[in-house]
UniProtKB/Swiss-Prot annotation:
Catalytic class of the enzyme: hydrolase
A GO biological-process term: nonfunctional rRNA decay
Identification of the protein by name: Protein pelota homolog
Annotated gene: pelA
Any Gene Ontology CC annotation: cytoplasm
Domain notes: The N-terminal domain has the RNA-binding Sm fold. It harbors the endoribonuclease activity.
Pfam families xref list: eRF1_1 (PF03463), eRF1_3 (PF03465)
Keywords for this protein: Cytoplasm, Endonuclease, Hydrolase, Metal-binding, Nuclease
NCBIfam families in alphabetical order: pelota
Disulfide feature: none
């Protein structure tokens, strides 16, 4: 995402959309009553016929729809302003926002949390592709902020089939991996697996892709369980430290350990977390994305809590529905805090 302009007087942010993650962030930030200015098309009656006419409109937002791993955000609302000749003011309309589009978002007042979220997204550039490989199977995935997208999950030919099968299988994996690298243009590749097959794949990848950094690590299996395992590793933090999905999994693991051994250093529930924040006791808070898509009053209360946490140098981790820890956190009221010190 690029922030092209921010007009403080109008509370208007002009943005250029560059990725799926950008669309997901806007889905979280946009609220009912916000106004957006964007290009769109609409069927307009011209005599006995109708044509889809391109135009720029001002839409008062009712709600947004975002489907994971698509390139589109749907913004539903009422047209507040449009070219006079079309006579469509006051009509319901949906803007389809795609990668490459520009949009202006106007709020009555931008919260510090929402602005910081925009700025953080604008600063974010790194992407990584993860390939888990074993002699008989492999999995290729890419993390987005809204979750992990599985690109490929396949079996390989048995080692007993013919001589040289290891090299052939390594080339098969490397070739498919290279195609995804061309498609997504990541900054780095992480190859992991339980045996030495990953080194064979790495050789092939380095021959095909000369200018991509390849990291190698060990993992117990080339499966989704192995993917969950690798997301908790320090190597992931080093390669993509700004991806909250990896950080969130590690923080949740820490919270569960504390609940078992030092439960006084963890609290959960909105009121309990709010009290801990007021005392300056919160080190890290994890919350599910649903809490920022709730009714205006609850959302406003949560945003105030998040602003207070940031002012007191606490860490905020937003957990999307596709995260492996989402349901675990939801069962704990959806919001949990790791504390700096014990409180009553």
């Amino acid at each position: 995402m690029r922030i092209l302009e921010f007009d403080e007087k109008r509370q208007a942010a002009k943005l250029h959309i560059e990725s799926e993650d950008d669309l997901w962030i806007l889905h979280l930030i946009l609220e009912k009553g916000d106004k957006v200015v964007a290009k769109t098309t609409r069927d307009i009656g011209l005599g006995k016929e109708s044509r889809r006419i391109p135009m720029t409109i001002v839409l008062k937002v009712d709600y947004t729809e975002f489907q994971e791993f698509t390139n589109r955000l749907r913004i539903h609302g009422i047209i507040e302003d449009a070219p006079e000749r079309f006579g469509i003011r006051g009509a319901h309309h949906t803007i389809n926002l795609d990668i490459g589009d520009e949009i202006i978002i106007i709020k009555q007042q931008w919260s510090k949390y929402a602005l910081d979220k925009l700025k953080k997204q604008a600063d974010k550039r790194s992407k990584i592709i993860i390939a888990l490989v074993d002699f008989d199977e492999y999995l290729i995935a890419i993390p987005f902020e809204q979750g992990i997208k599985i690109l490929s999950e396949k079996s390989l030919r048995s080692l007993n089939e013919e001589e040289g099968i290891i090299e052939q299988n390594a080339l098969e994996v490397a070739t498919e991996l290279a195609e995804y690298v061309k498609q997504y243009n990541p900054d780095a590749i992480l190859l992991a697996g339980p045996g030495f097959f990953k080194e064979e794949v790495a050789k092939k990848v380095n021959n095909i892709l000369k200018n991509k950094k390849v990291y190698i690590d060990s993992v117990s299996s080339a499966t989704r369980a192995g993917l969950h395992e690798i997301l908790k590793r320090d190597i992931i933090d080093k390669i993509m430290s700004d991806y909250e999905i990896a950080i969130g999994a590690k923080k949740m693991e820490k919270a569960m350990e504390l609940l078992a051994k030092q439960p006084e250093l963890v609290t959960y529930g909105l009121e309990q977390v709010k009290n801990a924040v007021e005392m300056g006791a919160v080190e890290t808070v994890l919350l599910i994305e649903d809490l920022l898509s709730s009714n205006n009053q609850e959302r406003l209360a949560i945003e105030r809590i998040l602003e207070d946490i940031e002012n007191k140098r606490g860490e905020i981790i937003l957990v999307p529905k596709e995260s492996p820890i989402y349901f675990e956190l939801k069962n704990l009221t959806g919001i949990l805090a790791i504390l700096r010190f014990r409180i009553n």
